[in-house]
Amino acid sequence: MVGVFLCLEDDMTNEKENQKKTAAGYRTATKLVRGGTLRSAFNETSEAIFMNSGFVYDSAEQAAGRFKGDNEGFIYSRYANPTISMFEERMILLEGAEAARGTASGMAAVNAALLSQVKAGDHVVAPKALFGSCLYIIENILPRFGVDITLINGTDLDQWRNAVTDKTACVFFETPSNPALEIVDIAAVSEIAHKVGAKVIVDNVFATPILQKPLQLGA
């Protein structure tokens, strides 16, 4: 990476908050281009690509506070850096989310989303019609951690109702599915899942937040 934002920590935090308030009123096209952007002191026209692994601190005390999580700021690019942070803020705006986490690939995102919601003994329900790599994670990876899996016809709400139990930690589906283009009723399945306390994970890769916002439909 080429450097560090040349501003005080409090100034950076205030600037982020001000930008969030401004961006909330953007139209979708503007959010796509400008959402989450936080320019450095060099006033670049588009998002800078930060390639450094570490960051500089004004003092040992500031560094200690950052690593302890007592104050905001970047510490190591494996956790976060300005480039990824801008991407995450843009996705928050587009999806209407509270938080986001960028990953290196779509399958990394799917794997992280699932593993963060389950533990040994939990249960996951998903449609049979999934992208091959997603299906592999659910059928082959999760069971290695002691997670039970039920695969169903995702277009049949009765099958969702019959599949979820009090051990169901989450449900996962794509809509439209890849590549079969099956459509799952997000609102209805979310209602079914939430009745047993299960989380809802929706792979929105085909529709994108331009055409569909799962969080607004109950996911």
Label every model-predicted segment.
Residues 13-81, 89:
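N-terminal "arm"/small-domain region of PLP-dependent enzymes with the aminotransferase-like
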Residues 59-108, 133-140:
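Conserved N-terminal alpha-helix of the aminotransferase class I/II PLP-enzyme fold
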Residues 24-25, 43, 68, 94, ...:
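A generic structural signal for short, solvent-exposed coil/turn residues
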Residues 19-23, 32-38, 100-219:
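Conserved PLP-enzyme active-site core in the AAT-like
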